[in-house]
Amino acid sequence: MTLPRQCAAACRTGGGGGGVVRCRAVAAAGGAVAVRDAVVAPVARRGAARKTAETVAGMWREVQGCGDWEGMLEPAPHPVLRGEVARYGELVGACYKAFDLDPASRRYLNCKYGRERMLEEVGMGGAGYEVTRYIYAAADVSVPTMEPSTSGRGRWIGYVAVSTDEMSRRLGRRDVLVSFRGTVTPAEWMANLMSSLEAARLDPCDPRPDVKVESGFLSLYTSADKTCRFGGAGSCREQLLREVSRLVAAYSGGGEDVSVTLAGHSMGSALALLSAYDLAELGLNRAAPVTVFSFGGPRVGNAAFKARCDELGVKALRVTNVHDPITKLPGVFLNEATAGVLRPWRHSCYTHVGVELPLDFFKVGDLASVHDLATYISLLRGADKKQPAAAAADAGGVLAKVMDFVGRRRGGGALPWHDAAMIQMGGLVQTLGLI
C-alpha cells in the first residue's frame, strides 16, 4: 500500500474498531528503521472501511497535510479536503463581515461585535467554534495623512477560536484556529508595498540571519501598540503566542488530539505563514501539527525561509487563482523561478512556501474577482457559474465600505504623493476586489 509521503507513524487514517485491521510496514535503509501504519480493511468490510476513511475525522491528518497532500489534489481535490478548505475560507470571511469601517463608530477599524457573539452576528453561529481572543496588529510605518498619529495604531486583524465539543467529534480532534483578514487600512497597504527582505530572527536559540521575510509583514507581526483600547496591547506575535500556547497546553494536556490551523486571505495569509513558522520554531508543533490554509497569498520570505519551514514541518496549502497578480508578489523578477539564473542575488529571491492548489477564475466568467475571497470559496464548493457573483455580492457591502474609506483618506490635506498612492490603491481594490 502506498502511503502519503512523510506521514510516518503520526498519520492515522482510521479508528481502531469497525473491522479495520492495522498493519505495520517496516522499511530499513542504512540502519535507520521507519515504522509506518497503514489501514487495511478486510474484503467483506471494504465499503464500510472506505466510508469511515473518507470522513474528516477519519482522515484529518491528511487534510492537515501530514503527507503534503500527495494524491489529494490531482486530478481534482479530494472532496473532503475541498470541503474543509472552503470551510476555513468562510471562517476567514467572517473577519471581513465583522470589521467596522464606519468612522462614526467607537469601534472604527476594529471588530463590531463582542467575541462571544461575533460568529453568530455574521451568520456563522453554527460554525462549531468559540472565539477565545481577538488579535490586533500595528504596522511600524508612517502614513502622512490628516491623522498622522493613527498610522501605527493597532487594528483588529483577526481572531483565535477553538472547536466546540460537538465539532471536535466531527473533526476527529480539537482544532485551534487562527483567522486573519486581508489588507484594508493605509498603513497595511504601505506594509504590503514594502518589498525589502529582513532577517526574521524569531528562533530564540539561533538568530538565523539567512532566514529572511518581507519587512512589511514582519513589522505587522512584531510591532506593538500599547494604547489599543480593545485589549490588543502587545504585538500580534505576543498575543498569538500566549493564546495558542495556552489552548494547546489545555487540550493536549487533557489527552486530546489537537491541531493548530492558521488561515488567511491576501495579507492575512502572509501573517498566517509567519505565525506558523514562529510556532514551529518554538516547538509548539511537537504537541500539535501546525497547518496554514492560504487564500490568494503573496510570497513571504526567501529560499532559506522556505527551507526552514520545510525542516520544521510547517504545512501550507496555498489556494491560488492562476490569474491573481497578488500571488506573484513580492519578487516579480527575483523569485524561485529565477534564483538559478540570478545566482548572485539568490538569497534575495522570494520563494513560495508549501503546496499549491490552483483555481482558474476564468472558468466562472467573473474576471473582476481575481482576488476575491468569496469567489475562491465558491469554486472550492463546486458552485456553478451563477453562484460566484451571488457570493461576491455578499462581500459587496464590505468592498463598498473599503472604497468609501479609501476615498475619505484621500481627501482633505493629504500630501500629493500620498493622494496619488491612495488613488492607485483604490483602483486596485475596485478592479481586483482586494478587501
UniProtKB/Swiss-Prot annotation:
Stated family: Belongs to the AB hydrolase superfamily. Lipase family.
GO biological process, one term: floral meristem determinacy
Entry keyword set: Chloroplast, Hydrolase, Lipid degradation, Lipid metabolism, Mitochondrion, Plastid, Stress response, Transit peptide
Induction: By high temperature.
Reaction catalyzed: a 1,2-diacyl-sn-glycero-3-phosphocholine + H2O = a 2-acyl-sn-glycero-3-phosphocholine + a fatty acid + H(+)
Keyword Transit peptide: yes
First and last residues of the transit peptide: 1-31
GO cellular component: chloroplast; mitochondrion
Active site: S266 (acyl-ester intermediate), D324 (charge relay system), H371 (charge relay system)
MF terms in GO: phospholipase A1 activity; phospholipase activity
EC code(s) of this entry: 3.1.1.32
Protein name: Phospholipase A1 EG1, chloroplastic/mitochondrial
Compartments where located: Mitochondrion; Plastid, Chloroplast
Role description: Phospholipase that releases free fatty acids from phospholipids. Catalyzes the initial step of jasmonate (JA) biosynthesis. Required for the biosynthesis of endogenous JA in seedling, inflorescence and spikelets. Not essential for JA biosynthesis after wounding. Mediates spikelet development and specification of empty-glume identity. Functions in a high temperature-dependent manner to maintain floral developmental robustness under heat stress conditions. Functions by safeguarding the expression of several floral identity genes, such as MADS1, MADS6 and G1.
Tissue: Expressed in roots, shoots, leaves, inflorescence meristem, spikelet meristem and floral organs.
Enzyme class: hydrolase
Span(s) of short sequence motif GXSXG: 264-268
InterPro entries: AB_hydrolase_fold, Fungal_lipase-type
Source organism (scientific name): Oryza sativa subsp. japonica (Rice)
